[in-house]
């Protein structure tokens, strides 16, 4: 990448909003006079999340490693039981909130019940995500850098289904609440690998390196919420941005709300209607180039991807302001406002 060796790097972490956190961290460092140009972004390889041994198995392996003679090793080996080798799925552990004990899909099921969001509405939203992503392939191709896997270039998102429909999605079975649930593999975000890189800097830094800025960061907010209803996180985050800078969603020409689950986004839209003037958002205004249901949700990268997509939409459409928001596993929300330069 041509970054000089003396330039340090650091990792930030805010679950689903980690990519956005990297952007706002750069902004904070610039405000503190710690630099004027930062390479930021996020990456996630969800296909390579490991399996784990149960906690008790690790202790038995440690005992085996400490054994000093053959008899000690035999005793350590004899302590193992078949259950010790039953793997724990790392992805499932990572997507389970330790406070509520709920896996993320169960939080979406909770919202679907509380807001009366039926299976048909979720599947219709999911099918629209694929349809919009397919229609926008030409617009987004310039923001994709090809990667090579086994010598083959991948230059387009491979999760988009050109034949997705409400009828096909209706054939899928619920995966969290298997008896009465409505959340399926088709109306939630895809498990995906992905990475995003952006430059965040001052106008002077952009001029110095000969680049034209895509836009300006004008506000951002992170807010907490009930972990069992983490999907509603965008609502308090947007409200905090209003309190800080007077910005309300209806001012945005472009709006991106991450599609962790169709039920979650629809619940956010329903809750925003209760927030007062300027907060109601029509469904057709959000995620006009598709969302994570079609494109995937590589957790560490999505926040930065949404910002990049929103900036490009502003420049393609001639809009002035964009609002980007995500729910965050563990009970948070993130909202970030951009302005076209």
Residue ranges and their predicted role:
Residues 14-44, 52, 112-138, 197-204, ...:
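Active-site-proximal alpha-helical scaffold in enzymes
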Residues 37-110:
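Flexible glycine-/small-residue-enriched beta->alpha junction loops
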Residues 82-94, 167-232, 236, 240-245, ...:
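Condensing-enzyme catalytic core mediating Claisen C-C bond formation in acyl metabolism
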